[in-house]
UniProtKB/Swiss-Prot annotation:
SMART domains in the cross-refs: IPT
Protein name: Nuclear factor of activated T-cells, cytoplasmic 1
Stored InterPro entries: Ig-like_fold, Ig_E-set, IPT_dom, NFAT, p53-like_TF_DNA-bd_sf, RHD_dimer, RHD_DNA_bind_dom, RHD_DNA_bind_dom_sf
One GO term describing the cellular component: nucleus
Annotated source species: Bos taurus
Repeat (Sequence) residue spans along the chain: 184-200, 214-230, 263-279
């Protein structure tokens, strides 16, 4: 105190004419520190103390007058203290009262721990350094004289009062009181965000504080009035997100403790920041994850469905003296120890009926949901378009036709298209060689449901077709575009979806597709990428369609266009083969082949190459070109002979046109055919030979393992193999050359039905099969007449041929 009085820097008596008389000299210390006169009652209403304040301000503070004497009165150095200025128009020194706001340097002595009921006997003298009670703060007492207190400004709203609301604070479980004019009835709207020095700070988790009994509390309360054990012991971040969260001490160096006193002027409106407890916040969550979520919810609490003053934001609601009986502040008693604050039981449901919808979990659902985009696609896709959850990958090799379906490119794209970069505008859609744009049609589809045609950019090298790494399809829009399209991303590849409509015969004109060039460095640095962007500038338009089948499966067809050169430099320098007059030729060579394309020179070379399965070159030969017939768009080549003249099957090779060391065209295919291949007409052999079939034929013809190519009338080597059923078979182990009796059993014992032979064939007239007498084996003497033996059927011999 004495140090401050002796310091000339803080003596503003001359500036404000405090010491103009002897009486003022006596009252200077009290006036210098903003103390009221001893005779002024602490419970005097603010209207009497400050007649210059407007009526709304008096009304707001009338309810707090009863506690001002206890809450703010104290004794410092055996002198009376207060926080209310003297009433009347004449100041203690006899000077007239200033009508306009004035600046005072007031020594804020804080709340003495021996006389204030808000402080507890918690001794932290050993932990915290003592502060000198000579700290001066800036106070603007007559702020309300020119500002309507009913309309809270951002400076005096919740975000600037982090002791009452944590919407602007990163502290998740508690806040700190202010050893500044924030706790006085006269608050400055522009208080400094940092009233303590960095070295005066302490760890954020050492103290907890509730709401101080200030008559100027915020109309809304913080959800952090409930400090549970979990929230108290939780981890704290090192720095807050807002400078408004201040750490305060008493001027005696003691840390301020919690206050169990609620605000005397609670909010009349049901704020969502009241009674949001552990079990009502996100179900089973025991503590708020971060006050940033609460701040976001508070900022979004302007929805009319929450009954917050018809959609008026919380910070802009006008406070009145109508106390709502259904809303009360949730206050918990201070714990005996700073680290053992007991959890407080939740509110009763009957006391807070207005917040039952918050308990039901609708609070976060209403304010954290993202609305749908208000601008839908102008040309939406047909809802009947088929989409399968398990479609083949884009790098799968699919056929272009299957069964009755065929996907065909009716009009091929132009061989050159300048792709645009990401940093420049579009260069238009891909065009066709003869003008217009490419077109694709699905043949064989007779259903009435539309399908979706997928288009992506694929590779054009000699490897398997796959999505291109350096080029993507680009959707073109504009007045001249007649085809609807939609962009989609499939496995990091942009795909353009185009409807195929039955009314258009399942045909689509591709006037909505451009080509986008990606940056080489972005692609080349990918893991596993081996291609080089500047050497891979050719692409293909790949079209794919998925056709649903009646059995529930999906038939996927794919077709790729001719190569398209996307680089302007490459299109001007590299040769390009579009057509070739011959696709195959004999191994002897010597035939002519005409190539059509671009960038052909007089010294252009055509190289034929045969590759091994591993990619190595097995054979390479330069073809002879006719320079006198060479043109920039055509080239005449004589096919060279193949390396092996004795091939027995066609061999496929490749060839390319070369204009220089690194100026080569794409590989083209050519097939060598074997020379002097005899053309022999062969017929497949019949596995069923009825002429050599013997045995039971009631069940049809039986296959023979080995056909008999002897004379038609000769007996087989094993006569027992052709015996009818009823004859004993020949013993397998007998080596005797003696022949067995070949007499047939009576026909009645056969299994054949009447009118049919034992072989199942119709009987001729007389009941005897047409037969020829078999020659008698040599060495067998003639015996008595016997029944005719079974004969071999010859399908080529008619019954009349026996005569």
């Amino acid at each position: 105190m004495t140090g401050l009085e002796e310091d000339q820097e803080f003596d503003f008596d001359f500036l404000f004419e405090f010491n103009q008389s002897d009486e003022g000299a006596v009252a200077a210390p009290a006036e210098h520190y903003g103390y009221a006169a001893p005779g002024l009652g602490a419970g005097l209403p603010l209207s009497a103390a400050h007649p210059s304040l407007p009526a709304p301000c008096h009304d707001l503070q009338s309810s707090a007058a009863g506690v001002s004497a206890v809450g703010y009165g104290g004794t410092v150095d055996s002198g009376p203290s207060g926080y209310f200025l003297s009433s009347g128009g004449i100041r203690p020194n006899g000077a007239p009262a200033l009508e306009s706001p004035r600046i005072e340097i007031t020594s804020y002595l804080g709340l003495h721990h021996n006389s204030s009921q808000f402080l507890h006997e918690v001794d932290v003298e050993d932990v915290l350094p003592k502060r000198s009670p000579s700290t001066a703060t800036l106070n603007l007492p007559s702020l309300e004289a020119y500002r309507d207190p009913s309309c809270l400004s951002p400076a005096s709203s919740l975000s600037s009062r982090s002791c009452n609301s944590e919407a602007s604070s990163y502290e998740s479980s508690f806040s700190y009181p202010y050893a500044s004019p924030q706790t006085s009835p006269w608050q400055s709207p522009c208080v400094s965000p940092k009233t303590t020095d960095p070295e005066e700070g302490f760890a954020r988790g050492l103290g907890a504080c509730g709401l101080l009994g200030s008559p100027r509390h915020s109309p809304s309360t913080s959800p952090r009035t409930s400090v549970t054990e979990e929230s108290w012991l939780g981890a704290r971040t090192s720095r807050p997100s807002s400078p408004c969260n201040k750490r305060k001490y008493g001027l005696n160096g003691r840390q301020l403790s919690c206050s169990p006193h609620p605000s005397p002027t609670p909010s009349p409106q049901g704020s969502p920041r009241v009674s949001v407890t552990d079990d009502t916040w996100l179900g089973n969550t025991t503590q708020y994850t971060s006050s940033a979520i609460v701040a976001a919810i508070n900022a979004l609490s302007t929805d009319s469905s929450l009954d917050l003053g018809d959609g008026v934001p919380v910070k802009a609601r006008k406070t009145t003296l109508d106390h709502s009986p259904a809303v009360a502040l949730k206050v918990e008693p201070a714990g005996e120890d700073l680290g053992t604050t007991p959890p407080t039981p939740d509110f009763q449901p009957e006391e807070f009926a207005a917040f039952q919808h918050i308990r039901k979990g609708a609070f976060c659902d209403q304010y954290l949901s993202v609305p749908q985009h208000p601008y839908p696609w102008a040309r939406p896709r047909s809802p009947a378009s088929y989409t399968s959850p398990s479609l083949p990958a884009l790098d799968w090799q699919l056929p272009s036709h299957s069964g009755p379906y065929e996907l065909r490119i009716e009009v091929q794209p132009k061989s050159h298209h300048r792709a645009h970069y990401e940093t420049e505008g579009s260069r238009g859609a891909v065009k066709a060689s003869a003008g217009g744009h490419p077109s694709v049609q699905l043949h064989g589809y007779v259903e009435s449901e539309p399908l979706t045609l997928q288009l992506f950019i694929g590779t054009a090298d000699d490897r398997l077709l796959r999505p291109h790494a350096f080029y993507q399809v680009h959707r073109i829009t504009g007045k001249t575009v007649s085809t609807a399209s939609h962009e989609a991303v499939v496995c990091s590849t942009k795909v353009l979806e185009i409807p195929l409509l039955p009314e258009n015969n399942m045909r689509a004109t591709i006037d909505c597709a451009g080509i986008l060039k990606l940056r080489n460095s972005d692609i080349e640095l990918r893991k596993g990428e081996t291609d080089i962007g500047r050497k891979n500038t050719r692409v293909r338009l790949v079209f794919r369609v998925h056709i649903p089948q009646p059995n529930g499966r999906t038939l996927s067809l794919q077709v790729a266009s001719n190569p398209i050169e996307c680089s302007q430099r490459s299109a001007q320098e590299l040769p390009l083969v579009e057509k070739q007059s011959a696709a195959s030729g004999p191994v002897l060579g010597g035939k002519r082949m005409v190539l059509s394309g671009h960038n052909f020179l007089q010294d252009s070379k055509v190289i034929f190459v045969e590759k091994a399965p591993d990619g190595h070159h097995i054979w390479e030969m330069e073809a002879k070109t006719e320079g006198d017939l060479c043109k920039p768009n055509s080239l005449v080549v004589e096919i060279p002979p193949f390396r092996n003249q004795r091939i027995t099957s066609p061999v496929q090779v490749n060839f390319y046109v070369c204009n220089g060391k690194r100026k080569r065209s794409q590989y083209q295919h050519f097939t060598y055919l074997p020379a002097n291949v005899p053309i022999i007409k062969t017929e497949p052999s019949d596995d069923y030979e009825p002429a050599l079939t013997c045995g039971p034929m009631s069940q049809g013809l039986s296959p023979l393992p080995k056909p008999c190519y002897g004379q038609p009338l000769a007996l087989p080597p094993d006569p027992g193999a052709c015996l009818m059923p009823g004859f004993p078979p020949r013993p397998q182990g007998s080596a005797s050359p003696e022949l067995h009796d070949l007499s047939c059993a009576p026909y009645g014992s056969a299994t054949a039905g009447p009118g049919h032979s034992p072989l199942g064939l119709p009987r001729p007239v007389g009941g005897v099969l047409a037969s020829q007498e078999a020659p008698r084996p040599s060495g067998v003497p003639p015996g008595p007449p016997q029944p005719p033996p079974p004969t071999l059927l010859q399908p080529q011999v008619s019954p009349t041929s026996s005569g």
